[in-house]
Amino acid sequence: MSRLLAPHLLAIGSGKGGTGKTLISVSLAQALAFEGERVLLCDADLGLSNTVVHLGLDSGGDLAGVLSGKRALADAVVTVPGAGGFDILAAPAGSGALADIGEDQAKRLVDTLRAAKNYDRVILDLGAGVDAVTMHFAASAEDALLVMTPDPASLADAYAFAKLLKRRGARLPYLIVNMAANDAEARRTSGALGTTCQAFLQSVPEYLGCIPRDAHVQESVRRQRPLPTLYPQAPATAAITVVARRLHNKIAPAPVTIRASGLR
């Protein structure tokens, strides 16, 4: 793809735990890399970092060093090996070492990530829930992506995320429904959230698609490998690829055509 002047920040969040948000973040990072994007996945779940576990890595780089200013971003990231490689920046898995950072430090991290012009996209894997730092990351990104499930409890939590995002002056997030039995169930779920948001927020999240229930997903988690690498033909991988292409097409610069009369 044509290179952007600055990376596009995509914050991936959920109103609650258990939605499969981190697996979606890891899978989208690889799927977008397959689309030709230079991707950095930043584990912004500062209280319970676990992207490293999903990827089977010994280290996810040195996020603490970047936050403290002791490490340059370029020296602190780790490249995920294999086809469709991307970089990752995380704290040690499950350490909770960065759980107490404030919004000022979160802002400095966003500024650092936005200045990383060697990437086309930075994905922020947010913590579950709607605490102040999580919502700061979500509102600071160019776009947020909300992951919800058909679980009725997920609707209230997803609405809380959307409401707080709008309260911070950001537009409503994109939406995907994970662990759906079928497309009809996913659309009912997204429709219910859309109805609530329209009634109280006067706008509706843009639905990007659903990720079906798929036994390959849990197997990829167990084997600590990205789903698109391990099971490229799985139904969930196909769905992730559709979402990735929709996201990619939203930021890919339009090609410049040269005609006899000049640039158009």
Model-derived segments and spans:
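Acidic-aromatic/histidine active-site loop/patch
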Residues: 1-9, 249-264
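Gly/Ala-rich phosphate-binding loop of Rossmann-like dinucleotide-binding domains
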Residues: 33, 138, 166
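Conserved C-terminal guanine-recognition region of P-loop GTPase G domains, centered on the G4
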Residues: 155-170
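Inter-motif core of Ras-like GTPase G domains
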Residues: 112, 117, 131-153
